[in-house]
Amino acid sequence: MAETIKVRALPQAHCKDCSLAPLCLPLSLTVEDMDSLDEIVKRGRPLKKGEFLFRQGDPFGSVFAVRSGALKTFSITDAGEEQITGFHLPSELVGLSGMDTETYPVSAQALETTSVCEIPFERLDELSEQLPQLRRQLMRLMSREIRDDQQMMLLLSKKTADERIATFLVNLSARFRARGFSAQQFRLAMSRNEIGNYLGLAVETVSRVFTRFQQNGLISAEGKEVHILDSIELCALAGGQLEG
């Protein structure tokens, strides 16, 4: 059975040397500010696929920035079923939703070998009082979570299966591009079943849509490798949503 992982401090790249810093941190932070932040960040051993970073109901104490790999967050419904609420890529924060109730409302599990930076929230909150630009960054991140939730509600309420999957692929493409990776060719860390769970679609529907997209020349896909062949048409099908 997968276990919740406690992140233990190990020597790793510092914030100011991290290639993800421009995405993860406000650009206005000075080297001295980054050093202050670096002092509170814990960096542990990588999580293996299937290991938990935290579980639904665990006491809230830290937020986590993904350094490499990918995580999924999910909640368990009253019927005991898993409902995926998000996929998280390098530079993205996980765990902020625990601030309200002081427990994590979702579980976070590694989709592949994944490294994270653990940031104890109390110390982050104290530091953000000294660094207004850091507090603004936290507010931006919380705003993005609200926006993502709103977009997801719209996605599930109004879009067809083709539109949902097109939106999902365009969103991933934009997020990979922002991280300096190819926007046209990337590997999906999640399974077709997990994509279906997230988008409210049966796995058979997901497979049929991927096949149809390939037949129509929108993408090519082999296993988890995806190559977007017609980004303009895919974006049009997604309703023109290019933002990650």
From Swiss-Prot:
Residues 192-211 bind DNA. InterPro entries: cNMP-bd_dom, cNMP-bd_dom_sf, Env_Response_Regulators, HTH_CRP, RmlC-like_jellyroll, Tscrpt_reg_HTH_Crp-type_CS, WH-like_DNA-bd_sf, WH_DNA-bd_sf. GO terms for biological process: cellular response to decreased oxygen levels; cyanide biosynthetic process; regulation of arginine catabolic process; regulation of DNA-templated transcription; response to decreased oxygen levels. The keyword DNA-binding applies. The keyword Transcription applies. GO terms for molecular function: DNA binding; DNA-binding transcription factor activity. Keywords: Activator, DNA-binding, Iron, Transcription, Transcription regulation. Residues 159-232 form the HTH crp-type domain. One of its GO terms (cellular component) is cytosol. A nucleoside 3',5'-cyclic phosphate binds at residues 21-149. Transcriptional activator of anaerobic gene expression. Possesses 4 cysteines which may bind a metal ion (possibly iron). PANTHER family: CRP FAMILY TRANSCRIPTIONAL REGULATORY PROTEIN (PTHR24567), FUMARATE AND NITRATE REDUCTION REGULATORY PROTEIN (PTHR24567:SF75). This is Transcriptional activator protein anr. It comes from Pseudomonas aeruginosa (strain ATCC 15692 / DSM 22644 / CIP 104116 / JCM 14847 / LMG 12228 / 1C / PRS 101 / PAO1). The lineage of its organism: Bacteria, Pseudomonadati, Pseudomonadota, Gammaproteobacteria, Pseudomonadales.
